[in-house]
Regions:
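Transmembrane helix boundary and interhelical junction motifs in multipass membrane proteins
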Residues: 188-193, 270-275, 285-287, 304, ...
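Short, small-residue-rich loop/turn micro-motifs
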Residues: 57-58, 262, 266, 352
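Glycine/serine-rich anion-binding loops at beta->alpha junctions
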Residues: 133-143, 185-187, 266-271, 360-372
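N-terminal membrane topogenic signal
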Residues: 27-42
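Active-site-proximal inter-transmembrane loops
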Residues: 127-134, 252, 280, 355-363, ...
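A juxtamembrane structural motif centered on a specific transmembrane helix
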Residues: 1-20, 24-25, 347-408
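Hydrophobic alpha-helical transmembrane segments of multi-pass inner membrane proteins, especially
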Residues: 39-55, 61-254, 292-350, 377-381, ...
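TM-adjacent membrane-interface loops and short helices in multi-pass inner/ER membrane proteins
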Residues: 240, 244-291, 298-302
Length: 408
C-alpha cells in the first residue's frame, strides 16, 4: 500500500472513530437518555428477577404449597401490580408528588404504629401486617418511599426560605429518627439502616457540610454498636462476619453456602434451573440470597450482568439528581439512588462476606411484593421527573404533535 493510500486509510479510520464517538456522545446527551436508561435497566433487572425467582423458589414452593410455581406466580402478580403503579407514577406530575408528601408520611407512620399492635411475626421479626389470604404488608418498605418524597418536599421548601443548614436539619432529622426507632422496635434492623442511608443521601444532595456527616457517622457507629450488644443474635452475626470459621455450621452456614454456590457456577454457570444449593442447603435462596443462585446458574457472566445493570441504574439516577434544576427532583433522585444502590451493596456485600448479614433483599430481583412495589413506584416517580426535564418536554411535545398530524 502506498503512503497516500495509507494516509487515506488512516484518515478514514479516524473519521469513522470520530463519527462513532460523536454518535455515542449525541445519544448520551439526548434529553430522554436518562429516562430510557432508568426504564431499560429497571425492566431488565425486573425480568431477570422473575426468571430467577421461578428457579430459586421452585423447591421451597413445592415443599410448602405442593407446586413449583406458586411463589413465582405470586411474584409475577407483584410485578404486574408494581408495573401498573410505575406507569401511573411515571405519568404523574412533579406537583402531584409534592402535594402528596404529607399524605405519604401520615400513611407510613400509621402503618408503622399499626404493626406494633396488629403485626404478625415472620422469621423472628414482628414487622408484617396480614392483608388477606397469603398476602402480607411490610410497613418499613413503604416508609422508605414516604421518607424520600416527604424529605425532598420539606427540603425543597426550606431551600427557598431558610438557607442555613441548622434549619434544614429540622424537622427532617427528628422525623426520620422517630421512623427509624419504630422500624427498629419491629426488629427490622436492615431497613433501619436503609432509612438512615436515604436520609444521608437527601441531606448530602441538599448541601449539608461534609463535617456533619462525620458527626452523623460517629453517632451512627456507636448506635449500631449499642444495638448489636443489646441483641445476642446480632452479636453472633458480627462475630461470624469477623471470623467465618467460628460458627460455620450455625450463623455462618448461609454465607458459606452462598459463597459455595458462587464458586460452583464458574464463568458460565451450571445452567438455568440447575442450582443444587436451592434444594435446601442455602436458606432464603429466593429472597435475601438470590444473588448466589444467579452466580451458580448463570456464572460470572450472570452476576456481572446484574452488577452492570445496577451500575447503569445508579448512574442514570444520580445523573438526574446532578443535572436537574428542580430542587425536588434533585433531592428525590438522591434519596432513591441511595436507597437502591446501598441496599444492593449491603445485600451483595453480605453474600460475599464483605459485610454482615442484615436481611435486606436485592432490589427488583429478590422475591417479595412489599419490597418490589414501593421500589417500582419510586422509579416511576423518577421517570416522571426525567420526562419533565425541559429538553425532554420539548421532544415529547414534538412527538405528540407529529403523531397528531399523522392521524389527520
Amino acid at each position: 500500500m502506498s503512503v497516500i493510500a495509507r494516509a487515506r486509510s488512516g484518515g478514514l479510520h479516524k473519521v469513522s472513530e470520530s463519527y462513532k464517538k460523536s454518535r455515542f456522545a449525541l445519544l448520551a446527551e439526548h434529553p430522554l437518555s436518562t429516562y430510557y436508561l432508568i426504564m431499560g435497566s429497571t425492566l431488565l433487572l425486573l425480568g431477570l428477577g422473575l426468571v430467577m425467582v421461578l428457579s430459586a423458589s421452585s423447591v421451597e414452593s413445592v415443599r410448602v404449597f405442593g407446586s413449583a410455581y406458586t411463589l413465582a406466580q405470586r411474584q409475577a402478580l407483584f410485578a404486574v401490580g408494581g408495573a401498573i403503579a410505575l406507569i401511573f407514577a411515571a405519568r404523574s406530575s412533579i406537583q402531584f408528588w409534592r402535594k402528596s408528601a404529607w399524605v405519604f408520611l401520615a400513611i407510613a407512620f400509621g402503618l408503622l404504629l399499626a404493626v406494633l399492635v396488629i403485626g404478625v411475626e415472620v422469621a423472628g421479626q414482628k414487622n408484617w401486617i396480614e392483608i388477606f389470604g397469603p398476602f402480607r404488608l411490610q410497613p418499613s418498605e413503604f416508609a422508605k418511599l414516604a421518607l424520600v418524597i416527604w424529605g425532598a418536599e420539606v427540603l425543597t421548601r426550606k431551600d427557598r426560605h431558610i438557607p442555613t443548614w441548622r434549619n434544614i436539619l429540622v424537622p427532617i432529622v427528628p422525623v426520620a429518627v422517630i421512623m427509624m426507632i419504630l422500624v427498629l422496635l419491629e426488629g427490622d434492623f436492615g431497613n433501619t439502616l436503609m432509612l438512615a442511608a436515604i436520609l444521608c443521601g437527601i441531606l448530602f444532595a441538599a448541601g449539608i457540610p461534609v463535617r456533619l456527616f462525620a458527626i452523623f457517622g460517629a453517632v451512627g457507629f456507636f448506635a449500631v454498636w449499642a444495638l448489636t450488644l443489646a441483641a445476642p443474635y446480632r452479636m453472633e452475626r458480627i462475630t461470624n462476619w469477623l471470623d467465618p470459621e467460628s460458627d460455620r455450621l450455625g450463623f455462618g452456614w448461609q454465607v458459606s453456602q452462598g459463597q459455595y454456590a458462587l464458586g460452583t457456577g464458574g464463568v458460565w454457570g451450571v445452567g438455568l434451573g440447575g442450582s443444587r444449593e436451592k434444594w435446601g442447603s442455602l436458606p432464603e435462596a429466593h429472597t435475601d440470597f438470590i444473588f448466589p443462585v444467579i452466580g451458580e446458574e448463570l456464572g460470572l457472566v450472570g452476576t456481572s450482568a446484574v452488577l452492570l445493570l445496577f451500575g447503569i441504574l445508579a448512574f442514570s439516577i444520580f445523573r438526574l439528581s446532578r443535572n436537574s434544576k428542580e430542587p425536588f427532583v434533585r433531592l428525590a433522585a438522591a434519596g432513591v439512588g441511595s436507597w437502591i444502590v446501598i441496599q444492593a451493596v449491603i445485600n451483595i456485600g453480605a453474600v460475599l462476606g464483605l459485610l454482615p448479614v442484615t436481611g435486606v433483599p436485592l432490589p427488583l430481583v429478590s422475591y417479595g411484593g412489599s419490597s418490589l412495589v414501593p421500589t417500582l413506584i419510586s422509579i416511576g416517580m423518577l421517570l416522571a421527573c426525567a420526562r419533565n426535564e425541559p429538553g425532554a418536554r420539548r421532544i415529547i411535545r414534538r412527538r405528540q404533535t407529529a403523531a397528531a398530524m399523522r392521524r389527520r
